[in-house]
Structures are given as structure tokens and as C-alpha cells.
Amino acid sequence: MQDQLPTFISSLQTIPFGTAFGYLFVLTLFTAFNWGLEAFKWKQLTFHLQPLSFKAAYAAILTGQAVSFSSINRVGESIGKSMLLSDGNRLKGVVLSFVASASQLLVTLLFGLIAVIWMYPSLHLQLQLQLQLSELVLSAFYGALFFLVGLFILCYIAIPFFANKLSKAPFFYRYAYLLASIQTLPKHLLLQLALVSGARYLVFLLQYLLIFKL
């Protein structure tokens, strides 16, 4: 990565200043808009736990981003987002943030599956030529891929059901109060979170396209 940095810098120097500034300005706007979408998700998720204004939800997202930069594998993001909640709701907020992350992961898997379907002819040929895989093995691979994505979709829809079952398990019984906010999540909210996550993914995609144009 460091070896490619001089090449990247030299390529930036060949771009007219006005064009580069315009691209960077648009990229910055997209980033702010993306955080706004995530703030909307957080506002909707915490509504029954602790109603937040959009401004407070946006501040929570920025706090989560700041904490995640100083943590390993961004694990501090959930903690950072919950820091602006009241004392009794912070741990519940951390649990809720995993639902937001699950909705984003769901969309990422779906778009990945769409990419596999779109690239199927060339991907299928490359796997056959380079890895010498038989048709049976490839069929099993594609079948497992579809199955796992489908299973994740079902698990996402059933998050309230699993939370309810876990809260009654002996080991999790003492932590049942943390799962209470998830048990009552309506399915339409889970769908709404997935749709907003899809919009975030499209914004990410546009940002990458703009970067490739630099």
C-alpha cells in the first residue's frame, strides 16, 4: 500500500486543480449525506428506547466514527454511538447498533450476490480454468452461496424472535433487559433499515466511481 502512495500522489498532480477540487467536494458531500442516512437509521432504531432528534442522532454517528478510528476493527463504533444516550440506555444502545450493522451487512451480501450473478459467465469460466473445478463443485459452491445469503435474510427478519428466545435461556437470562429493545422491533422497521442501508450502499458506490475518475 505504501509503495503505491507515490504513484497515487503523482496521478493526482496530473489532474487540473479545479477538477480535483470539484471531485473532492462532491465526495465530501456524499460522505456527509451517508452519515445522514446512518443517523436516520439510528434515530428510527432508538425511537422506542430513547427518542432522539436528527441532530442528536447525527452527533451520535460522528461520535461513533471518532471512537472507531481509535479502536481495533472499528469495534468502538457501537460504543461511540451509544455514548450520547442516557446512562441506563447505553448498553441497550450498543445491542441496537448491532441491528443497524446487520442491516448493512445484509445489503452488502445481496449486492455481492447480484455481482456474482452478473459476472457469472466470466467468473464461472475463470474458476474452471484456474482452479480446475468441476461443474458439480461449482454448482455446490453457487448453491451454498445462495443458501447462506438466504439464511442470513431469514435470520435478519427473525432478529426479534431470536432475541426473545435468548432472553429466556439460562445463560442470557440476567441480560434479558438488554435484549428487550430488540424483541419489540417491528418487521416494517427492519425493512426500512434495510432500504436505507441499500441507499447507503449506492452512495458508497457513487463515491468509488468518482474516485476511479480521479
What is each model feature region?
Residues 35, 39, 69, 73, ...:
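Transmembrane alpha-helical segments of multi-pass membrane transport proteins and ion-pumping complexes
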Residues 54-59, 88-102:
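Membrane-interface alpha-helices at helix entry/exit sites of multi-pass transporters
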Residues 58-84:
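Extended non-transmembrane interhelical loops and adjacent amphipathic helices
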Residues 46-52, 77-91:
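Transmembrane-helix boundary and interhelical linker motifs in polytopic inner-membrane proteins
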